[in-house]
């Protein structure tokens, strides 16, 4: 398999010492990623936001794609986080199936449970990880239970982010965009403390979310994507990961309070099941 370093050398005459998706070379910022389902739509997306975004660099053969990879260059632009969130709530003429969301979440919980079982058997793991695993497994199961309250079989889609972070490089990253339920970015923004509960309610009203979308919003707030991603994809024995897990453990009470506040607000729009142990 050809490495990213070899692709950069062979097709762009860029020479780096180590692989990195984001990098600088001769005073310019670059990003290298594989072609994805959103590649063709990306220019229209950033144009709609009034930004230049990431721009394609043609290779030495004057072609945009090099062995299924695309190289972009970019400059940090002034932006407002709210414009990304507002755009994510614009409905597309596409729908996502609720059943597929449920199946995906069940698969994530099952895989994480398996990995957590392996980690928990290691003496080197500290007790915080065990507490977190029980807590987040419970949240995940509660989220799926709430998901079952949705009556429609499909939800309206929007242009969302895999990781919703208030950072230009992540918000405009061509590989960080996905067609998903238009609720995804809204839920992530609240969970990541990027918006307050008052702002969350304003977006609900402005976007005229349906009852089913509000139910799904609550289930997304409950589902512990960040912890499950760590449990599945990362080595939880790693010192940096342990530090992240410890921070999660220390923040559990704040997270519970945030979920209760959101539940109280959302419950004004539709009756939502209360999680007794929150």
Question: Could you tell me what each predicted segment is?
Answer:
Residues 216-223:
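Central hydrophobic cores of alpha-helical transmembrane segments
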Residues 228-278:
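ATP/Mg2+ or Mg2+-diphosphate-binding catalytic cores
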């Amino acid at each position: 398999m050809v490495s990213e370093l070899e692709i950069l050398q062979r097709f762009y005459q860029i020479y780096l010492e180590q692989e990195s998706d984001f990098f600088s070379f001769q005073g310019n910022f670059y990003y290298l990623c594989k072609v994805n389902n959103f590649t063709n739509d990306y220019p229209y997306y950033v144009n709609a936001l009034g930004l230049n975004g990431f721009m394609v660099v043609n290779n030495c053969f004057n072609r945009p794609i090099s062995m299924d990879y695309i190289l972009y260059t970019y400059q940090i632009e002034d932006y407002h986080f709210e414009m990304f969130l507002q755009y994510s709530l614009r409905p597309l003429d596409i729908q996502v199936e609720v059943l597929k969301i449920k199946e995906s979440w069940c698969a994530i919980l099952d895989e994480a449970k398996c990995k957590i079982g392996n980690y928990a058997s290691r003496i080197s793991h500290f007790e915080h990880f065990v507490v977190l695993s029980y807590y987040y497994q419970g949240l995940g199961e509660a989220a799926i239970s709430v998901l079952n309250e949705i009556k429609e079989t499909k939800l309206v889609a929007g242009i969302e982010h895999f990781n919703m972070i208030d950072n230009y490089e992540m918000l405009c990253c061509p590989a960080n965009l996905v067609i998903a339920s238009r609720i995804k970015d809204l839920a992530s923004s609240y969970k990541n403390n990027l918006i307050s509960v008052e702002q969350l309610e304003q977006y609900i009203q402005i976007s005229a979310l349906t009852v089913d979308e509000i139910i799904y919003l609550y289930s997304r707030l409950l589902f512990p994507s960040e912890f499950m991603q760590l449990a599945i994809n990362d080595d939880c024995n790693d010192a940096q990961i342990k530090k992240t897990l410890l921070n999660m453990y220390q923040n559990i009470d704040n997270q519970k309070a945030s979920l209760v506040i959101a539940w109280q607000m959302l419950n004004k729009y539709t009756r939502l099941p209360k999680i007794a142990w929150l």
